[in-house]
């Protein structure tokens, strides 16, 4: 009798059915995440068919094509040069640095073998080929204590690693922990301390702190002993190591102690001058990028003279920053009562807020202004002690040589001041020097009456000299636009004004030196409380006779009138608010200084505004009814035909008429690191990716990975716009080589304090410096055909609760301290993209804020590019209809459409068409069109991975069915034979 295989067929049926179900589910899921899967697998979704001849279609050629190896060398060199000009020498007692060639050194802390190269999250970088500090120093001629290195790298000290929160679904989870090696373990390691004397020219201690996307640095929750919860303070293990190194220096084992600050966030710096630690020199190196360690080694050994200047105020203790009591985790006390909730694991919050109570007084603008008022006896400064709080001010940086100024001159015309000064290298070491020009505006009775604030000094211009040899001089000339004299008057004129009174310009070695120069020009001396004498000879006074409310009340870029746009972000002007904010004011420092979190209670109207229900519109602003646009026309147009035509050329209407509603919708709402192809107009798909330090990660669709440059904060610290142009050009070339058409960078959010998780990704605490450094980078990237998305526009200055946190600030601060960082990239460099914020401005999501995206960005600044949201899949408030109304064009994410149900709504249909017009206008003039002629057709194809899925589904469907048939047949046969 033949054996019955019923059980076998049953098992096979179940197994194949399970695989079939898996294939079906995989097919559904991968097609839902179609964009991301294509990006990850580098899959083509279309092919180009071109039967005609249209000349050269390499519109943006790769000038390094065929020379990839040489380009890599150039990238390495530029990375090192950026670090060389950005690293800041903070301290150098008795010329402890440079160490000289052949120095024998010992590297301390686990961070010496595991340095910070960038940040985490969207700005993470590929540093797989980066030379470590040991290799860099050895290449520079130093000898390294390899026994100590091995102890940290692979020995008993290797398990002591930093803990940094990991980014998951746009929210970082985990703890910040320093976790450095205890000194007791070093002492216990057999023979380790015996090696120190042989490598005793210097003990180099690396202090590293990491930041990243999704979570701010811990102010009270750091788990390391001795920090009191402050991640930017020294841990007990670090303190013990530094104390032990001092003891070893005192007994002659080490000659000097050098600290490297490997952090883009300003640490508490009081310890650097604490005699308990005996530190001789300190060098801030930030996030060094892939090859920045080569420059760090050059600075330490002396082949490079540091010329970087601080872009933030470095405090002895960051607790002195006035913003900290209103930072990170603030919750409306009556949120639950008003029906507001926090949902989706902090990926969507309706209950959190932050008040920028410090107003314009960010960073040095607070510390220097209160210092000046203390000296002059103005504004009730109280017992303020500048020297006890500030370690190094904005713009500070030492050199291995000395520079001197002479022949300071200022001329002026109706548009600008022109400042010139001679800079002479008075030392023996060749070096570069940064010339910094600061302006002081008068603080008038009108200002006090109308709530206008003025900092004692504001950066107004800068330039870096060439390399100057001993006794060599250079005359540096800097233009200062008179527009910088303006201040925003929200409560009086409702526009920009120029106050009557005395304005000062001065050249200063840093912000504090600038204040002292102006105080000297006013007749003050050290006898009045100045901590050092200033130079009146380095100042210029200009007197504005009358208050001017007209000159800057109209946009120079567009001719539009400028007026209040952000009343609803200021709790003192927002009609629904019952909270009054006492903003920090130099009219009464002691009485207005923030001492506790500003408590904000939600009103009924505020709760309604937070809900922000969509209200359909039927007529435009002129009273004309909206009508449905044309779809699916056959006009014979292709996108390539529009190349070079103005945005308002009539031909655009014919092109847009060819598209379907579905095509337009698919492009707009599914723009996670890409935009879809549009067959009706032969639009190719595009690839966009992150890139604050360069296009360094192929995860989202790049064909290769480029070099990771130093963090943006180091770029800014070069104070060298020529380097920014070089960096931008190289990032653009990276885009061409990786087939990346757009880059989510640069970013110009402000270092409101040292604890923002993404300070590494932003330039500075100062909006002027941020804007001046970002603009040339933007231009250079776009000159290569790669469009930028400057981000995060705007007021995304913390990571905690970033998905929905409500930012409350006054209009002067919003415009002067934050938005000003972005303006030059639009008005001068014509940025073609902006990425919005996840948070809210007042109660309104930034991606739907018409005041920001339409009235200011497009209306005042003349922006004609694409606005894309930040990642929007997790938050229900990132409503597409409202975003289109506000001025957003693309949604970075994948989620169900809010637009489909309104495809017959002429208002929404026209907004969608407007968004597509903007997108196409940018992309047709970009590298996305390389290889596509006006006669080319984009033909959709099934991707290889889809074909694989379809075949697998079909195969296991057939196998399941066949096995099921055999199983049933076996059962019947068994019954028959029973």
Predicted regions and their residues:
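Glycoside hydrolase catalytic-domain context in secreted enzymes
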Residues: 1-487, 497-503, 511, 562-978
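Terminal connector regions
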Residues: 482-558
């Amino acid at each position: 009798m033949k054996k019955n295989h019923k059980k076998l067929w049953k098992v096979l049926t179940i197994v194949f059915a399970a695989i079939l179900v898996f294939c079906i589910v995989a097919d559904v899921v991968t097609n839902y995440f179609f964009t991301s899967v294509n990006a990850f697998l580098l899959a083509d979704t279309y092919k180009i068919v071109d039967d005609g001849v249209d000349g050269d279609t390499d519109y943006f050629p790769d000038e390094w094509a065929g020379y990839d190896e040489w380009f890599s060398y150039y990238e390495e060199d530029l990375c090192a040069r950026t670090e060389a000009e950005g690293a800041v020498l903070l301290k150098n007692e008795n010329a402890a640095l440079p160490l000289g060639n052949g120095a024998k050194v010992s590297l301390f802390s686990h961070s010496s073998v595991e340095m910070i190269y960038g940040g985490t999250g969207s700005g993470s970088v590929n540093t797989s080929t980066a030379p470590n500090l040991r290799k860099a120093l050895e290449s520079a001629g130093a000898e390294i204590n390899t026994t100590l290195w091995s102890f940290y790298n692979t020995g008993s000290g290797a398990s002591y690693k930093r803990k940094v929160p990991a980014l998951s679904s746009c929210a970082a989870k985990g703890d910040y922990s320093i976790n450095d090696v205890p000194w007791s373990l070093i002492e216990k390691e057999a023979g380790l301390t015996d090696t120190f004397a042989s490598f005793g020219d210097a003990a180099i201690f690396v202090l590293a702190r990491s930041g990243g996307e999704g979570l701010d640095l811990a102010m009270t929750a750091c788990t390391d002993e001795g920090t009191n919860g402050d991640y930017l303070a020294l841990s007990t293990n670090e303190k013990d190591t530094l104390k032990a190194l001092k003891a070893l220096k005192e007994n002659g084992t080490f000659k000097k102690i050098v600290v490297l600050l490997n952090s883009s966030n300003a640490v508490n710096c009081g310890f650097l001058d604490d005699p308990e630690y005996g530190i001789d020199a300190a060098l801030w190196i930030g996030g060094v990028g892939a090859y920045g360690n080569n420059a760090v080694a050059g600075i330490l050994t002396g082949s490079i003279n540091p010329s970087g200047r601080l872009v933030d105020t470095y405090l002895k203790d960051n607790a002195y920053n006035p913003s900290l009591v209103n930072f990170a985790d603030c919750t409306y006390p009556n949120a639950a009562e008003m029906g507001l909730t926090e949902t989706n694991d902090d990926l969507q919050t309706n209950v959190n807020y932050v008040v920028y109570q410090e107003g314009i007084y960010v960073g040095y603008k607070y510390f220097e202004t209160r210092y000046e008022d203390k000296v002059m006896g103005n504004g009730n400064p109280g017992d303020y002690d500048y020297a006890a709080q500030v370690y190094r001010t904005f713009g500070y940086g030492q050199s291995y040589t000395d520079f001197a100024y002479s022949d300071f001159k200022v001329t002026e015309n109706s548009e600008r001041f022109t400042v010139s000064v001679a800079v002479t290298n008075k030392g023996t070491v060749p070096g570069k020097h940064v010339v910094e020009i600061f302006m002081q505006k008068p603080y008038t009775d009108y200002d006090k009456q109308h709530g206008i604030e003025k900092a004692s000094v504001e950066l107004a211009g800068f330039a870096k000299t060439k390399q100057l040899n001993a006794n060599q001089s250079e005359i540096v000339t800097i233009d200062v636009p008179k527009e910088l004299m303006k201040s925003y008057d929200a409560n009086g004129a409702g526009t920009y004004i120029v106050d009557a009174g005395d304005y000062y310009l001065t050249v200063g070695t840093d912000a504090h030196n600038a204040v002292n120069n102006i105080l000297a020009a006013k007749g003050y001396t050290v006898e009045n409380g100045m901590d050092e004498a200033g130079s009146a000879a380095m100042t210029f006074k200009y007197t504005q006779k009358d208050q001017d409310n007209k000159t800057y009340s109209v946009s120079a870029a567009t001719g539009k009138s400028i007026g209040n746009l952000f009343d609803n972000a200021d709790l003192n002007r927002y009609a629904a608010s019952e909270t009054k904010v006492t903003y920090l004011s130099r009219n009464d420092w002691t009485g207005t200084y923030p001492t506790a979190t500003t408590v904000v209670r939600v009103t009924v109207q505020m709760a309604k505004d937070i809900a922000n229900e969509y209200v359909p519109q039927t007529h435009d602003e002129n009273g004309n009814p909206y009508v449905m646009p044309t779809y699916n026309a056959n006009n014979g147009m292709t996108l390539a035909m529009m190349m070079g035509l103005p945005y308002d050329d009539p031909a655009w209407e014919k092109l847009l008429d060819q598209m379907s509603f579905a095509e337009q919708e698919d492009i707009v709402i599914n723009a996670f690191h890409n935009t879809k192809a549009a067959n009706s107009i032969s639009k190719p798909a595009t690839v966009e990716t992150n890139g604050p330090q360069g296009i360094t990660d192929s995860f989202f669709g790049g064909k290769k990975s480029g070099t990771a440059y130093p963090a943006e904060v180091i770029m800014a610290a070069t104070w060298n716009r020529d380097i920014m142009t070089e960096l931008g050009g190289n990032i653009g070339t990276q885009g061409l080589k990786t087939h990346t058409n757009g880059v989510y960078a640069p970013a110009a959010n402000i270092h409101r304090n040292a604890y923002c998780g993404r300070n590494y990704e932003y330039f500075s605490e100062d909006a002027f410096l941020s804007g001046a450094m970002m603009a040339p980078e933007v231009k250079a990237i776009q000159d290569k055909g790669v469009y930028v998305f400057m981000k995060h526009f705007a007021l995304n200055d913390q990571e905690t609760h970033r998905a929905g946190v409500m930012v409350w600030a006054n209009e002067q601060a919003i415009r002067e301290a934050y938005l000003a960082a972005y303006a030059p990239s639009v008005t001068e460099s014509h940025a073609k993209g902006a990425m919005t914020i996840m948070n809210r401005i007042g109660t309104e999501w930034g991606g739907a804020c018409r005041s920001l995206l339409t009235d200011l960005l497009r209306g005042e600044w003349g922006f004609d590019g694409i606005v894309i949201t930040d990642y929007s899949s997790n938050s229900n408030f990132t409503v597409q209809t409202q975003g289109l109304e506000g001025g957003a064009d693309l949604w970075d994410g994948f989620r169900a459409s809010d637009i489909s149900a309104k495809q017959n709504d002429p208002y929404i249909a026209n907004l969608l068409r407007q968004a597509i017009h903007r997108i196409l206008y940018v992309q047709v003039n970009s590298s996305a069109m390389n290889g596509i002629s006006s006669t080319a057709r984009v033909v959709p194809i099934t991707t290889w991975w889809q074909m694989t899925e379809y075949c697998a589904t079909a195969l296991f469907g057939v196998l399941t069915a066949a096995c099921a048939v055999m199983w049933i047949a076996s059962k019947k046969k068994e019954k028959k034979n029973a």
